[in-house]
């Protein structure tokens, strides 16, 4: 009878196969034990991984996640949405040669669930699709790469805007969202541009001349057959040309921003007057980032100054749903951002905003009078008086007050107005905190306001889908 060695997973017959190298010594060491505690101690029995053991696994992809997993809710909501706006740029059509395009519903589901999980990178999402069972369940065997995911995330601004409108309209139809009272707040989000990438006009002009010269020299070197650089592949040559061309384009975009910045600077100096403040503003030269021309240095919540964008969010105070999204490079909320947001909310919901809650940074007499003419009651606190003796008397009527200003002061002094205004912090502040902490709005790594707005729309969509999935599916 042949000798048989009993192992954890199989029996190896001597004579029919060889003992794997090192296995006999390992088994002997296990039988002998450590020996440090004495010969009478029993051998330790352990379950060790057998990573070379072949096995046949039969599994249905639908069994990867449980029936109550949140990813199923995201997929179900997307199945009920109209994503035809994402299909228009697709070139793969019936009767036309070419590879089939990836279903936009899959890509929408992937990015929505990525925002739910706080993932804000195309490479990280592609990695999760390889390693995470929830994302594997969403893919259902369809392969995706980081370039496809990143392009889809920022190339469909209009379709994303319509998708958010579609979700909000569904909530309005189900009588969940009512925009009679809306709260608005801005959150400054750090962008990818570095603080040292900001340059003045003289330096930008010099860099642009150098970039143009570099593009010309690069084309000559790569296109010349006698040049040693011509030995690079066509793909490498195209990549070098593209990088040089994109740098030149970024510098041209930065220079194109200077007239607008100069105009704003002159307006700020005019408001400051001819004193020291106005003189200080006039002496300062505007600077633009060579990485992201539309980014601006803003004062952040931590008190520091960093390149950022201003993400404006409007929230329904009753349902806490996000009903408006806008992105600007205005460092101050007092730059007339309330009226455009009110108009956007009314267009999305076909409703009428009657009460608009704002923090003190939005206070402008012009906005108060404009809202009064439209029949909208603004709830915004006054700015504290500079004179300590006059603090607490900011809402007292003055001889030159207009009818709109008098109505606003009376409204903010009343007990009813104070109770209404308390809802602003309970809605806008908590929604902003959730998007920054859990929905991927902590930092924006794309360049330009248009792409930054796409990121904000994805985050708002993920927020609404997660909080109102039951209503949307009902």
Regions inferred by a protein language model and the residue ranges of each:
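Anion-binding and metal-coordination hotspots
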Residues: 2-28, 32, 37-44, 48, ...
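Helical catalytic core of nucleic-acid polymerases
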Residues: 83-84, 93-104, 128-141, 146-152
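Glycine- and acidic
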Residues: 59, 89-96, 106-114, 321-328, ...
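Basic, short loop/linker segments at the boundary and entry of helix-turn-helix/winged-helix-like folds
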Residues: 64-112, 117
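Poly-acidic low-complexity segments
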Residues: 60, 78-83, 103, 145, ...
């Amino acid at each position: 009878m042949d000798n048989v060695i009993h192992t954890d997973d199989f029996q190896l017959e001597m004579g029919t196969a060889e003992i794997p190298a090192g296995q006999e010594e390992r088994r002997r060491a296990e039988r002998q034990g450590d020996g440090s505690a004495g010969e009478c101690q029993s051998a330790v029995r352990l379950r060790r991984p057998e990573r070379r053991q072949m096995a046949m696994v039969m599994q249905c992809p639908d069994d990867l996640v449980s029936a109550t997993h949140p990813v199923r809710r995201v997929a179900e909501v997307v199945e009920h949405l109209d994503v035809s706006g994402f299909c228009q740029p697709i070139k793969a059509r019936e009767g036309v040669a070419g590879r089939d395009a990836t279903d936009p519903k899959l890509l929408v589901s992937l990015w929505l669930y990525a925002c739910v999980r706080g993932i804000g990178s195309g490479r990280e999402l592609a990695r999760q699709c390889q390693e995470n069972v929830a994302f594997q369940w969403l893919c259902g065997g369809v392969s995706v790469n980081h370039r496809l995911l990143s392009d889809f995330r920022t190339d469909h601004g209009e379709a994303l805007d319509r998708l958010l409108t579609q979700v909000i309209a569904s909530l309005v139809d189900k009588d969940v969202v009512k925009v009679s009272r809306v709260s608005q707040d801005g959150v400054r989000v750090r962008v990818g541009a570095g603080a040292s990438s900001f340059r003045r006009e003289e330096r930008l002009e010099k860099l642009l001349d150098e970039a143009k010269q570099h593009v010309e020299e690069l084309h000559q070197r790569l296109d010349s057959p006698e040049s040693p650089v011509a030995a690079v592949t066509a793909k490498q040559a195209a990549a070098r040309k593209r990088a040089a061309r994109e740098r030149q384009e970024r510098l041209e975009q930065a220079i194109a921003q200077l007239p607008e910045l100069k105009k704003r600077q002159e307006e700020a100096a005019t408001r400051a007057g001819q004193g020291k403040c106005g003189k200080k503003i006039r002496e300062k030269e505007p600077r633009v980032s060579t990485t992201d021309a539309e980014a601006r240095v803003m004062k952040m919540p931590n008190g520091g100054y960093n390149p950022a964008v201003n993400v404006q969010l409007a929230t329904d105070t009753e349902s806490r749903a996000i009903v408006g999204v806008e992105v600007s490079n205005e460092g101050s909320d007092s730059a007339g951002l309330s009226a455009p947001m009110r108009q956007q909310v009314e267009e999305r919901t076909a409703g009428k905003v009657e009460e608009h809650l704002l923090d003190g940074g939005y206070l402008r007499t012009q906005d108060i009078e404009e809202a009064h003419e439209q029949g909208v009651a603004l709830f915004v606190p006054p700015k504290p008086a500079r004179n300590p003796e006059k603090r607490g008397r900011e809402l007292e009527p003055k001889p030159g007050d207009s009818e709109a200003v008098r109505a606003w002061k009376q409204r903010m002094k009343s007990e009813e107005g104070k109770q209404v205004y308390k809802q602003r912090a309970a809605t806008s502040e908590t929604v902003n905190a959730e998007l920054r902490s859990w929905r991927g709005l902590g930092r924006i790594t794309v360049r330009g306001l248009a792409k930054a707005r796409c990121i904000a729309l994805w985050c708002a969509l993920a927020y609404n889908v997660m909080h109102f999935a039951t209503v949307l599916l009902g």
